[in-house]
C-alpha cells in the first residue's frame, strides 16, 4: 500500500477539480511549501491567494469568497489556524453557516530506530 501525506492528497484533488471548476480558490497563510500547495499555485495562479502571515484575514477572506459563490479552501499550519483565527472561524464561518473549508497541516519529525 502506498502512503502519501494528507496535504499532498488534498493538493492532488484540488489540482484535478480545478481543471474544470474555476470557482475553486485556495488561500494559504505563507505556507504553500509546508502545505504542499506549490503545484496548485504554479498551475492556477489566478485561483491561488497568498495571504501572508495573517490567519485571521485568511479565514475572513475565505468566508467572504464563499459568500460570493466561490469554493474556498484555506490552508494554514495547525498551531496557527486553531489559535490565531478562532474568532473568525466562529463568527465569519460557523455563525453565518458559510460553506468555506479550512484545513490544517502538521509536520512531525520522523526518527529511525
Language-model features: locations:
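Short, ordered loop/turn segments at secondary-structure junctions
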Residues: 31, 77-79, 106
Amino acid at each position: 500500500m502506498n502512503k502519501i501525506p494528507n496535504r499532498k492528497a488534498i493538493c492532488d484533488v484540488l489540482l484535478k477539480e480545478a481543471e474544470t471548476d474555476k470557482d475553486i480558490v485556495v488561500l494559504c497563510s505563507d505556507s504553500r511549501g509546508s502545505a504542499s500547495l506549490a503545484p496548485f499555485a504554479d498551475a492556477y495562479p489566478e485561483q491561488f491567494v497568498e495571504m501572508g502571515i495573517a490567519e485571521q484575514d485568511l479565514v475572513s477572506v475565505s468566508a467572504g469568497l464563499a459568500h460570493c459563490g466561490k469554493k474556498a479552501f484555506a490552508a494554514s499550519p495547525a498551531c496557527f489556524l486553531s489559535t490565531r483565527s478562532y474568532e473568525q472561524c466562529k463568527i465569519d464561518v460557523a455563525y453565518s453557516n458559510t460553506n468555506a473549508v479550512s484545513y490544517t497541516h502538521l509536520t512531525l519529525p520522523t526518527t529511525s530506530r
